[in-house]
C-alpha cells in the first residue's frame, strides 16, 4: 500500500488486548489460569522467566511514536487504557500497534495490528478491535487489540501559519508548565558586550535596541542575593571571573566565581549547586578532544565549605531494561544551565525580595567568555590568557599560542511568575538527587520573598508572556505522577513505566507550525527526523533520531511553495561539533547532519519541481557557520612553544583562521516568538529521557507580526545578531522571508567563505557569517564543494563519515 503523509496530530488510545498467546514460552498457548499459575511459581522460586510484562507501542511505519506502561501478571488480557497526543510528520501506509513482552535485555514480539492511514484522513474517530498478526501478517490465534484513533490534519489547525495571532494566545498545549503573563525577559548575545558594539536598530515606539551583558548581570545577581543562590550546570568552573572588561570595572569584580560563591554562603545565603557527574561517556569521547567538565575539581573545591555542591549523575528512571539503564547513566548528561537568586525589588527602598532566574546555553565555566568580536589571537595576553580554550587540537595550549576557539552563545534572564517555574524545576531536581533537604522554605518567608506575581503591568508595551519547557524524566525530577492518566493531565508523556517531560520538542513543533514568514535558528547541532533519511549505507529505523524538527521545517517550506508564498529558514551551526574534527565521533555527527540536510533539501526540490518553479533550494533553506580570520598585529602575544609540524594546529595558526564555535540553542519565528534554552537540535536534547534540558518560549503581546512586521525586542535581538555575524545592517534584513534578503545574506556569506578559505590574507575578515561549505543540487542532493572535501587546515571531511563502532544513540 502506498505511503501517505500524516502531518498533524494523532490522538490515540490503546484500551486492551484479548486472547494473547506467547510463542516464546512452552505454556504460551495454555489457558489463562495455567499460565498465571506457572508464572507465579517461577516468580516465587526465582526460576524461569517469571511474570510476563506486556506493553504495546504505536508506530508510524518504523518510527515509534508512543508506548504504554508494562502490565504484569496479565498474559492473556492486559488492560492499559492509555491515551497519546502524537505530533506526526511521517510518510506511512499504516498505523501499527505492536504488542511485546519485556525482557531484562530487549523485548520479545507477540504480534502487530495494522490500521490503514487512508482510513484516518477524513478526521473521524475510529474505535475498533484489530486482529493481531505475526511477522508474516498471519493471525496469531484469536488475539486482538482494542484501539481508538482520530487524526487532525495540520492544515485544519486554527493556528497553522497564523503566528501568535493575538495577546490571548494561550501558549503551547499539553505541557507541564503553563504560560505566564506579566513577565520581563532580557536577551543576551554572548557572555559580554563591550561598549563599542553599538548596532543602530530601530524598534517600535521610537525606541532603539540596547544590548545587555550576561555575565555582568549574573555577577550582580549573585553578589546581591540575600537568601538563596541555586545553580545547575553541565559544567561549573570555580576559577573563572565573570567581570573582565577593563572599561567596565565593578567593585569586587576580580573575584573568582568559586570565591564569590563561598563568600555568599559564609554570609548566610543558601548556595546549592547541581553539577553533572561526568562518569563515563567521557571515556569513549575524551580521546576525541572533548573538554573536561571539572566536576571533580569543583566538588573538591567546595568540600568542607558552606557551599553545597552535589555531583549529579544522569540516573535512569526505575523502569528501563538493564541495557537502557546502562545507556542513560553512561551516555547522557544533565545539560540544564540555570541560576536562580532572590533579588531586590525594582523600587530600591523595599525590604521585600523577588525571584530572578537565568537560563540559556552558557555554562559558568572556562572557554565561555567572549564578545561579538570573537578574536582568535588578540586577547591571548589579556582576558583569554588564563582562559585559553582549544579542544579541537591535540595539545592545544596557551604556551603554543592561538588560534583559541571563540565561543558564540545566547542566554536570558527571566523575571516575574516565569522565574518561579525555573525555581520549581530546581527544587524538583534537588529533591530527587540533591540528598539533604537544604532548600530554602520560601513559605516561611512570606513577608520577605513575595509570591509569584507580575513584574509588568498588562498595559505596559514591554511586557512579555513566557512559558517554560523541559526535557527531563522521573529519574531526574521529584514528584512526577505515577500513572499515565495523571501524567497526561500534567502535560507529561508516559511510556513503559517512564514519565517524561518532552515539552521542548513540543514547543519547537508548535512554533514551526505557527510560523508565517521566516525562521532563524542558531544551534550547536542540527540532526534528526531520521525516519525520513535516505537508506544509503544505513537502516534509518536503527538510528533512532526520531524528533520532528527538521521534517517540520521542510514541510513548512513545502506548504508555502504549494501556496505560492515566500518562506525562508536560516540555520547557523558550528563548522563541526567541538572536538578533533577527524575523530570518529565528530565525523559521525557530520554524517547525520548531512543526511538531515539532504532529506530537507530533497523535500524542497521535489516541491519546486511539482509546482513548476525554477529556483535554488537555498533560496528557501540555507545553512551557515561562523569563522574568523585575523592579520597579525604588532605587539601581539608571542607563544613560547610551537605546535607540532604538519598538524591542524600549526596549519590554522599559520593561516590565522578558525571557526567560531556556535553553542547557541535558539529559534526566532517571524521576529515575534523566541525559544532560548540548553537544548540542541538532536535526539539527546529533544528525547526527554536522554539529556536533561530546560528552555523558554516567549513573545511580547504588543509586538506581534499580525498586520505589520513585529518590531519589539525579539526583532532587535535578531538584527543585533545579524550585525554581529555580517558586520553590517541592510534595510533588506528587515524582511528575512524575501528572496532579496536571503540572496543578499547568501551572497555575503559566500564572499566571506571565499575570504576565509583563501590562501591569501590581506585584511581581517569583515564579518563572521560563512556559507556552510556544501553544494546543493537541483534534486536536493548535498555534495562537496569543488576542491573542498575537507575543512580548511584539516583532513576532516565536511560531509562526515559513518562510524562503524560508535552506536548511533551516542552521536545522535
UniProtKB/Swiss-Prot annotation:
Superkingdom as given in the UniProt entry: Eukaryota
Binding site for a 1,2-diacyl-sn-glycero-3-phosphate: 335, 524, 663
Cofactor or coenzyme needed: Ca(2+)
Keywords: Calcium, Hydrolase, Lipid degradation, Lipid metabolism, Metal-binding, Repeat
Catalytic function, reaction form: a 1,2-diacyl-sn-glycero-3-phosphocholine + H2O = a 1,2-diacyl-sn-glycero-3-phosphate + choline + H(+)
Binding site for Ca(2+): 190, 374, 408, 724
Entry annotation: catalytic residues: 335, 337, 342, 663, 665, 670
Protein name as it appears in the record: Phospholipase D alpha 1
Source species: Zea mays (Maize)
Amino acid at each position: 500500500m502506498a505511503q501517505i503523509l500524516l502531518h498533524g496530530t494523532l490522538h490515540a488510545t490503546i484500551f486492551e488486548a484479548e486472547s494473547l498467546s506467547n510463542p516464546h514460552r512452552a505454556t504460551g498457548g495454555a489457558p489463562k489460569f495455567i499460565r498465571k499459575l506457572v508464572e507465579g511459581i517461577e516468580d516465587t522460586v526465582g526460576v524461569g522467566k517469571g511474570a510476563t510484562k506486556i506493553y504495546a507501542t504505536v508506530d508510524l511505519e518504523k518510527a515509534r511514536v508512543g508506548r504504554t506502561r508494562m502490565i504484569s501478571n496479565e498474559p492473556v488480557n492486559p488492560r492499559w487504557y492509555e491515551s497519546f497526543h502524537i505530533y506526526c510528520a511521517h510518510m506511512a501506509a499504516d498505523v501499527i500497534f505492536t504488542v511485546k513482552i519485556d525482557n531484562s535485555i530487549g523485548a520479545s514480539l507477540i504480534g502487530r495490528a495494522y490500521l490503514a492511514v487512508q482510513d484516518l484522513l477524513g478526521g473521524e474517530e475510529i474505535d475498533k478491535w484489530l486482529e493481531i498478526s505475526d511477522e508474516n501478517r498471519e493471525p496469531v490465534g484469536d488475539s486482538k487489540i482494542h484501539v481508538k484513533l482520530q487524526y487532525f490534519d495540520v492544515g485544519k489547525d486554527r493556528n497553522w501559519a497564523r503566528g501568535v495571532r493575538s495577546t490571548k494566545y494561550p501558549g503551547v498545549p499539553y505541557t507541564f508548565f503553563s504560560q505566564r503573563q506579566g513577565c520581563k525577559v532580557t536577551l543576551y548575545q554572548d557572555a559580554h558586550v563591550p561598549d563599542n558594539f553599538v548596532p543602530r536598530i530601530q524598534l517600535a515606539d521610537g525606541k532603539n535596541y540596547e544590548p545587555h551583558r550576561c555575565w555582568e548581570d549574573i555577577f550582580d545577581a549573585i553578589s546581591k542575593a540575600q537568601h538563596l543562590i541555586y545553580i545547575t550546570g553541565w559544567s561549573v568552573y570555580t576559577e573563572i571571573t565573570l567581570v573582565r572588561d577593563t572599561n567596565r570595572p565593578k567593585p569586587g569584580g576580580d573575584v573568582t566565581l568559586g570565591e564569590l560563591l563561598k563568600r555568599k554562603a559564609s554570609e548566610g545565603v543558601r548556595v546549592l549547586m547541581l553539577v553533572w557527574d561526568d562518569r563515563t561517556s567521557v571515556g569513549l569521547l575524551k580521546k576525541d578532544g572533548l573538554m573536561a567538565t571539572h566536576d571533580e575539581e569543583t566538588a573538591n573545591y567546595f568540600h568542607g565549605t558552606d557551599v553545597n555542591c552535589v555531583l549529579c549523575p544522569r540516573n535512569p528512571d526505575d523502569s528501563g531494561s538493564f541495557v537502557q539503564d546502562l545507556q542513560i547513566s553512561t551516555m547522557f548528561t544533565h545539560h540544564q544551565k540555570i541560576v536562580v537568586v532572590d533579588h531586590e525589588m525594582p523600587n530600591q527602598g523595599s525590604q521585600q525580595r523577588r525571584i530572578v532566574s537565568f537560563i540559556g546555553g552558557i555554562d559558568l565555566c572556562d572557554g565561555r567568555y567572549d564578545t561579538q568580536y570573537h578574536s582568535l589571537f588578540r586577547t591571548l595576553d589579556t582576558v583569554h590568557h588564563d582562559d585559553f580554550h582549544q579542544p579541537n587540537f591535540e595539545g592545544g595550549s596557551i604556551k603554543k599560542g592561538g588560534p583559541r576557539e571563540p565561543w558564540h552563545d545566547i542566554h536570558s534572564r527571566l523575571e516575574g511568575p516565569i522565574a518561579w517555574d525555573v525555581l520549581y524545576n530546581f527544587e524538583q531536581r534537588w529533591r530527587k538527587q540533591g540528598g539533604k533537604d537544604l532548600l530554602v522554605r520560601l513559605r516561611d518567608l512570606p513577608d520577605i520573598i513575595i509570591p509569584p506575581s507580575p513584574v509588568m503591568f498588562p498595559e505596559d508595551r514591554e511586557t512579555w508572556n513566557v512559558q517554560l519547557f523541559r526535557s527531563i524524566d522521573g529519574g531526574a525530577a521529584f514528584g512526577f505522577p505515577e500513572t499515565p492518566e495523571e501524567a497526561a493531565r500534567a502535560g507529561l508523556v508516559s511510556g513503559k513505566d517512564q514519565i517524561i517531560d518532552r515539552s521542548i520538542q513540543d514547543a519547537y513543533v508548535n512554533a514551526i507550525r505557527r510560523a508565517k514568514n521566516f525562521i532563524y535558528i542558531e544551534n550547536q547541532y542540527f540532526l534528526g527526523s531520521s525516519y525520513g533519511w535516505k537508506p544509503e549505507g544505513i537502516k534509518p529505523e536503527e538510528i533512532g533520531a526520531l524528533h520532528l524538527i527538521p521534517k517540520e521545517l521542510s514541510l513548512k517550506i513545502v506548504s508555502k511553495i504549494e501556496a505560492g508564498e515566500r518562506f525562508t529558514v536560516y540555520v547557523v551551526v558550528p563548522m563541526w561539533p567541538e572536538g578533533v574534527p577527524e575523530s570518529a565521533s565528530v565525523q559521525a555527527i557530520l554524517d547525520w547532519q548531512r543526511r538531515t540536510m539532504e532529506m530537507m533539501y530533497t523535500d524542497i526540490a521535489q516541491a519546486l519541481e511539482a509546482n513548476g518553479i525554477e529556483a535554488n533550494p537555498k533560496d528557501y533553506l540555507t545553512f551557515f557557520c561562523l569563522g574568523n580570520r585575523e592579520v597579525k598585529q604588532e605587539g601581539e602575544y608571542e607563544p613560547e612553544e610551537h605546535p607540532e609540524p604538519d598538524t591542524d594546529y600549526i596549519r590554522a595558526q599559520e593561516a590565522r583562521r578558525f571557526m567560531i564555535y556556535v553553542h547557541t540553542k535558539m529559534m526566532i519565528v517571524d521576529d515575534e516568538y523566541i525559544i532560548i534554552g540548553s537544548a540542541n537540535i538532536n535526539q539527546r536534547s529533544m528525547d526527554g529521557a536522554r539529556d536533561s534540558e530546560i528552555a523558554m518560549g516567549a513573545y511580547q503581546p504588543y509586538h506581534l507580526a499580525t498586520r505589520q512586521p513585529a518590531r519589539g525586542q525579539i526583532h532587535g535581538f535578531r538584527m543585533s545578531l545579524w550585525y554581529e555575524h555580517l558586520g553590517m545592517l541592510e534595510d533588506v534584513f528587515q524582511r528575512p522571508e524575501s528572496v532579496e534578503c536571503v540572496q543578499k545574506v547568501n551572497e555575503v556569506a559566500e564572499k566571506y567563505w571565499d575570504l576565509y578559505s583563501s590562501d591569501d590574507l590581506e585584511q581581517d575578515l569583515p564579518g563572521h557569517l560563512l556559507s556552510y561549505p556544501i553544494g546543493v543540487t537541483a534534486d536536493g542532493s548535498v555534495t562537496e564543494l569543488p576542491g573542498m572535501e575537507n575543512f580548511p587546515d584539516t583532513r576532516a571531511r565536511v560531509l562526515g563519515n559513518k562510524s562503524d563502532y560508535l552506536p548511533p544513540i551516542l552521536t545522535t
